[in-house]
């Protein structure tokens, strides 16, 4: 769960200690990229048993077990890129600022500001995926919450040609229906006191006036679309795996038929094979519903695989941005180059 540059520093430190102290290391992880990078010998486990073992080269180049092959093929293949000219702009952000005051003293006077987001500008087209990558504290989540009007901000946010900063009450409610967010933690984002029918149907209770039978029909339909069984609606979040919980979160957002989905680290808490399943699901529903995505992550390899355009953030500002292919083939900023090198990407 470390940022990519910190991850590299920790790995380098471990390898240095191993060499100088002549130590052996048992490294436990679900990150196959790191396993391939540092391991001499690999054991693959499933359900408490070692199902395959061998040298790193043998495991990665000639796997024998079907489960090992599945793991190695689980790297996200990315969303379908629409290279044709997109129809229109769905979101425009200009000079967005999210500053949190620093108050000190007996009178709690403002002594300065934490500039979580500072003068950010970008646009997003229909059916496009914009990747936002940066380390912890770079301002990614604050930017997402500001776009959704969940925290105060300054600057211009235009969604479907409507300035969100001027919206109130009913008009703001309409926007919230059209722009949904899927959070990082599938364990903390679902209420443990609500069953799946209540969780997925909560948005309908706010935004739609429909009969109970129609409500249940819509819930069952959306559960089916995200790969969950109908008989799950009476169960509670603690009865599900992390991947299933994230599918429930996707269903909750998707049932309102939004135009924009903000995905805030949606796979970082999941195992590699489950990550791939969730990414493939997101790809499928984007194509089916013509959705626009803002995909937030500190995993630059994942961002590369899913994004049409990328924004690199650091300390609340945009360090570099551009089309995915151009940004990776010809990065201009040292920070971008550092992220790419740390992820072993070319």
What residue spans do the PLM features occupy?
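A short, surface-exposed alpha-helical micro-motif characterized by mixed small hydrophobic
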Residues: 35-37, 303-305
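ABC ATPase "signature
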Residues: 50-54, 62, 321-322
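ABC ATPase NBD coupling module
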Residues: 58-63, 106-111, 164-180, 206, ...
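Conserved ABC transporter NBD signature motif
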Residues: 155-164
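Conserved ABC ATPase "signature" region
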Residues: 213-231, 340-341
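A short, proline-enriched helix->beta-strand linker immediately N-terminal to the Walker B motif
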Residues: 255-259
């Amino acid at each position: 769960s470390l940022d990519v540059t910190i991850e590299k520093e920790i790995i380098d430190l471990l390898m240095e200690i191993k060499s100088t102290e002549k130590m052996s290391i048992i490294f436990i992880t679900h990150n196959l990229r790191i396993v391939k990078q540092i391991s001499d010998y690999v054991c693959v486990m499933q359900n408490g048993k070692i199902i395959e073992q061998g040298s790193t080269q043998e495991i990665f180049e000639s796997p024998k077990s079907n489960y090992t092959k599945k793991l190695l093929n689980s790297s996200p293949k990315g969303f379908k890129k629409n290279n044709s000219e997109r129809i229109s702009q769905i979101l425009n952000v200009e000079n967005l600022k999210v500053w949190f005051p620093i108050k000190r003293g007996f009178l709690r006077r403002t002594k300065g500001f934490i500039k979580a987001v500072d003068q950010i500008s970008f646009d997003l087209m229909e059916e496009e995926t914009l990747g936002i990558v940066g380390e912890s504290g770079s301002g990614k989540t604050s930017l997402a919450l500001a776009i959704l009007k969940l925290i105060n901000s300054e600057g211009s946010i235009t969604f479907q040609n409507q300035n969100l900063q001027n919206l109130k009450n009913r008009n703001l409610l309409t926007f919230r229906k059209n722009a949904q967010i899927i959070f990082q933690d599938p364990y903390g984002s679902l209420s443990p006191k609500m069953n799946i029918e209540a969780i997925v149907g909560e948005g309908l209770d706010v935004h739609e006036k429909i009969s109970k039978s129609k409500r249940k029909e819509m819930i069952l339909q959306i559960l089916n679309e995200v790969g969950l069984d109908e008989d799950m609606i009476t169960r509670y979040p603690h009865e599900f795996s992390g991947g299933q919980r994230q599918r429930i979160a996707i269903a909750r957002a998707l049932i309102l038929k939004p135009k924009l989905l903000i995905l805030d680290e949606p796979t970082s808490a999941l195992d590699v094979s489950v990550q791939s399943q969730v990414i493939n699901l997101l790809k499928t529903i984007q194509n089916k519903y013509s959705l626009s995505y803002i995909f937030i992550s500190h995993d630059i390899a994942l961002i590369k695989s899913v994004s049409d355009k990328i924004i690199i953030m650091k300390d609340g500002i945009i360090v570099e941005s551009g089309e995915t292919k151009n940004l990776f083939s010809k990065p201009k900023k040292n920070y971008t180059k550092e992220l790419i090198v740390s992820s072993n990407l070319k």
